[in-house]
Amino acid sequence: MARCGVASRRASEEIITSGRVTVNGASVTELGTKVSEKDCVCVDGKQIFIEEKKRYVLLNKPSGYVCSLSDEKGRAVASDLLKEAYTERLYNVGRLDMFSSGLIIFTNDGEFAARLSHPSAELEKEYIVDSSSPLP
């Protein structure tokens, strides 16, 4: 389900165990259930399909947006800036503070995101900071 852009792996597990998934019309609540390309998989009654095309988007995030897929406080979310141009679910790779601006990658390629963001990759990241106030 994560490869279909429905939700993250952890959220997909919750969706499955809560009984919101059907395979060929039968409810499925067991994690690890195998399906084939011929099976009809639905979440909340809507059929889902595997995302075949990998998408990589570089966004110049403006200040005032949260780097998250949703925000319980109702704040503006950076991924919303992409919704008009892209229909698939895109995830941010890393994050920037709400009040900072800068480049951030969004993708539907979970393996790519993990290679960039997991500490074991030991990738060096460089940040350039401009402050509107003098630093102490």
Describe each PLM feature range.
Residues 2-136:
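Basic, flexible Lys/Arg- and Gly-enriched helix-loop patches that mediate nucleic-acid binding at interfaces
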